[in-house]
Regions:
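GST superfamily/GST-like fold recognition
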Residues: 103, 145-169, 177-183
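Short amphipathic alpha-helical segments embedded in low-complexity Lys/Glu-rich regions
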Residues: 39-40, 113, 172, 202-207
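Surface-exposed helix-capping loop/turn segments at secondary-structure junctions
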Residues: 135-146, 168-169, 193-199
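Membrane interface segments of multi-pass transport proteins and intramembrane proteases
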Residues: 83, 172-176
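Non-globular targeting/processing and membrane-anchoring segments
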Residues: 122, 131-132, 159-164, 185-224
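Short capping/connector residues at structural and topological boundaries
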Residues: 48, 87-88, 147-148, 153, ...
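GST-like domain detector, emphasizing the conserved glutathione-binding G-site
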Residues: 1-147, 214-224
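Hydrophobic/aromatic-lined pockets within catalytic cores
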Residues: 74-78, 101, 138, 159, ...
Length: 224
């Protein structure tokens, strides 16, 4: 089939889940760092519709969109299964993965870095979503049980990404006291060696987010 290449950025929460999956599966791959301000011709060639990371190239196969890539990885490399065996449990995991990408991820940035009424509304939405996930993880080490699974990889960004964006933006969203089970899960997840390997250095990541905040706010301020 050929080698495996991952076009990604170190900061992308969607790229991280693919790195984690490949690591857990023991798949050797080439990490190709993309600059989203100056996208490479190969990235635009492989993902001409969305023009974004991550992109997985496996021989002649090109796969885009992180949840689709995770499914491809699961079906191609059988070692360390990520999805549950039971069909209902698999469907449930996929439901919460979609919930994460559609309901939780979009408002988090505004909740942590926004201002005024928009920030308050976004924070309310995020807290509602986190409360639902808190119920799902109660009494469990991981969403996948005793081992890291598909849903842990999808939600893994919560364990480090939110706190870094909170620090950069100055707004607290994820309080350990409000979501103790989710907080403990995050600690279990982030301190797993294979997971920790793919997390960007804290100081550099916070600096990256701070720059992004300044850039986005400057664009908003200059809008007519």
């Amino acid at each position: 089939m050929g080698g495996v290449k991952l076009f990604a950025t170190k900061e992308s929460l969607f790229s991280a889940r693919i790195q984690w999956a490949l690591k857990l599966k023991g798949v050797e791959y080439e990490f190709i760092l993309e600059d989203l301000a100056n996208k490479s011709p190969l990235l635009l060639k492989y993902n001409p519709i969305y023009k974004k990371v991550p992109v997985l190239v496996h021989g002649d196969n090109v796969i885009v969109e992180s949840l689709v890539i995770l499914e491809y990885i699961e079906e191609t490399w059988k070692e360390h299964p990520l999805l549950p065996r039971d069909s209902y449990d698999r469907a449930t995991a996929r439901f919460w993965a979609k919930f994460n990408d559609e309901k939780l991820v979009p408002p988090v940035w505004t909740a942590c870095t926004g201002e005024g009424e928009a920030q308050e509304k976004a924070k309310e939405s995020v807290l509602e979503s986190l409360a639902l996930l808190e119920k799902q993880i109660e009494g469990k080490k991981f969403f996948g049980g005793e081992q890291i699974g598909y849903l842990d990889l999808v939600l893994g960004w919560i364990s480090y990404w939110i706190s870094a964006v909170e620090e950069a933006g100055g707004n607290k969203v994820l309080e350990a006291e409000m979501f103790p089970s989710l907080h403990q899960w995050g600690q279990n997840f982030i301190h797993t060696p294979l997971i920790e390997e793919c997390i960007p250095a804290r100081e550099a990541f916070v600096a990256y987010v701070q720059y992004a905040i300044i850039y986005i706010r400057s664009i908003s301020a200059n809008k007519p």
